């Protein structure tokens, strides 16, 4: 990737280079090496990718880079943790929802559901063999004072409004799981007489928060600058950390002598993915989304699975189990 020549703060792939070839070569150099050069990191088993091609949201057919990830995951026995992608364009809500925060939250959630076909998974998050991660409206900043010009439209811990939604190819479960992506605020619209809808867009909160605090380029070469961000990339990075911890647990083989032996290391990437999914759940999302979106019992599970995947990851459930399991 390199800085975008026309959009400040954005990145683009190298011109005149096919991205799938660049990615294939990079992974091959990690695992196998290239030419006279040995493998750069042959012990690597989990790889985090947060790219999100905004012009290629999933509709029906898997992207070329998604197919490449499926092949790489199978051929090299790797776990790819991939961000679902962000849809940061403004959206509209009915004008009646702009009068108070409760109505605005409900209107935003319904709009997110009704426009889900336009907010599909971004490549390479459409890969079947990858663990695709969505974002929740959560971070560690604590209580904040929301200015009068902004709205906090998402209930704490709910799926973020900016996150891409499923389903995946062939109605597969995508995103697989959700994790903390950082809270995002939205600009409070000004309602004019005669309007039936108002536009709501993301507020700029990089300096003041909320969001996840991350390192950022500093002026004059300074190395201590941080900003607040939100996105599925943040969530994917946190899930990658949990995946690495699970690999360490499996490699340590720290079990009681009377326990069954752990599976062979060749199955560890698949096991780690299963553990992450198993430690996720809908929890209260099931009832709240059914009620607020007025879903009927016949279609609710299918529709909610497209929005929620397997649910929100609970890190406290990872690497542990009850004594009878």
Language model features: what each stretch is:
Residues 1-61, 268:
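Subtilisin-like peptidase catalytic core
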Residues 52-54, 85-89, 136-139, 183:
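Catalytic metal-binding/acid-base residues of hydrolase active sites
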Residues 1, 20-25, 227-249:
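Active-site alpha-helical elements of protease catalytic centers
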